Amino acid sequence: MKNTAAGVPFILICVLLDILGIGLIIPVLPQLVGDIAGSQSAQAWWLGAMLVAYGLMQFCFAPTLGALSDRYGRRPVLLLGIFGLGIMFLVPALSQSLPVILFSRILGGMFAGNIAVAQAYISDATDKAHRA
């Protein structure tokens, strides 16, 4: 096994970005949706959809990202995840369309299943004697 412990800071940054993707937009989202959506019921629907979309897609696509990391390697899958999250962080800042923002949350959630890949990377970097 090659020594991959040098990549641990990269892994921690990937996990941090995944976690930021969940909650970073929460303080801004009510104002953003309130400016675009009309009624309170529409605002509530859009807020709920945007908050659920990220977590649901993360839950659904984590096994897929894990399988891809087994096939193509951990680092390429993690880099793909960072790219997808970068798009997700950028789109709400530039868009005035709720469906586009919702799509960015869905896309971000699809790419944010990197926690499982990060755990596999750490497992690869740890020798059997030091595993729990």
PLM features per residue range, with description:
Residues 3-35, 106:
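Pair of pore-lining "gating" transmembrane helices in MFS-fold secondary transporters
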Residues 59-99:
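Conserved MFS/SLC helix-loop-helix module at the cytosolic interface between two early adjacent transmembrane helices
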Residues 4-8, 91-104:
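Helix-loop junctions at membrane interfaces in 12-TM secondary transporters
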Residues 14, 50, 78-88, 104, ...:
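Residue-level signature of the transmembrane alpha-helical cores
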Residues 103-132:
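Cytoplasmic helix-loop-helix junction between adjacent transmembrane helices
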Residues 32-37, 71, 121-126:
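Helix-to-coil boundary motifs at intracellular loop junctions of multi-pass secondary transporters
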Residues 23, 51-63, 113:
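Residue-level signature of mid-helix packing/kink "hotspots" within the transmembrane helices
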Residues 30-59:
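Extracellular/periplasmic helix-loop-helix junction of adjacent transmembrane segments
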